[in-house]
């Protein structure tokens, strides 16, 4: 028996909507990363974009466990400006309470996806919104009950 390898014409993408209200960030990000890659499908092919399209709503209400949400000594995100001494930092709590709280989920998922051209294509299938409104109703997304899968997913 030969190993099955999907062709680009055989791939069917599905639309999912996930409500991130009171959901633990790391658990959500790892599940979304697997779904973006397509590893939940039996027809998974590593070199093709066979993952689904995912819409995450209520990103501003995602939960962090432990001391990660603490604004003073919580989870710190670093970036480098390119200049000497140009390391800037911000915390997850500041981002969640700031102007773009959806960036916390996008960064968590992006760091779990492969860092190449295929990973960039898979990340383009992720749509994150801070509140419950999204413009993808025409795609008729299926509701994915992430909170009901495991009691630890919800906080």
From Swiss-Prot:
Role according to the record: This protein is one of the early assembly proteins of the 50S ribosomal subunit, although it is not seen to bind rRNA by itself. It is important during the early stages of 50S assembly.
Keyword Transcription regulation: no
Record bears the keyword Zinc-finger: no
Alphabetized UniProt keyword annotations: Ribonucleoprotein, Ribosomal protein
Annotated protein name in UniProt: Large ribosomal subunit protein uL13
Taxon lineage: Bacteria, Pseudomonadati, Pseudomonadota, Alphaproteobacteria, Rickettsiales
Organism: Rickettsia akari (strain Hartford)
BP GO annotations: negative regulation of translation; translation
Coiled-coil ranges per UniProt: none
Signal peptide: none
GO cellular component: cytosolic large ribosomal subunit
Subunit structure: Part of the 50S ribosomal subunit.
Stated family: Belongs to the universal ribosomal protein uL13 family.
GO MF, one example: mRNA binding
């Amino acid at each position: 028996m030969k190993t099955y390898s999907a062709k680009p014409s055989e791939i069917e993408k599905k639309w999912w909507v996930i409500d991130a209200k009171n959901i633990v960030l790391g658990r959500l990000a790892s599940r979304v990363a697997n779904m973006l890659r397509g590893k939940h499908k039996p027809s998974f092919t590593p070199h093709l974009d066979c993952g689904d399209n995912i819409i995450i709503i209520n990103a501003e209400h995602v939960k962090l466990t432990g001391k990660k949400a603490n604004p003073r000594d919580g989870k710190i995100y670093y970036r480098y400006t390119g200049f000497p001494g140009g390391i800037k930092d911000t915390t997850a709590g500041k981002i969640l309470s700031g102007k773009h709280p959806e960036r916390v989920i996008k960064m968590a998922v992006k760091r779990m996806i492969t860092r190449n051209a295929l990973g960039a294509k898979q990340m383009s299938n992720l749509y994150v919104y801070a509140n419950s409104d999204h413009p993808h109703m025409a795609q008729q997304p299926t509701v994915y009950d992430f909170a009901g899968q495991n009691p630890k997913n919800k906080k």
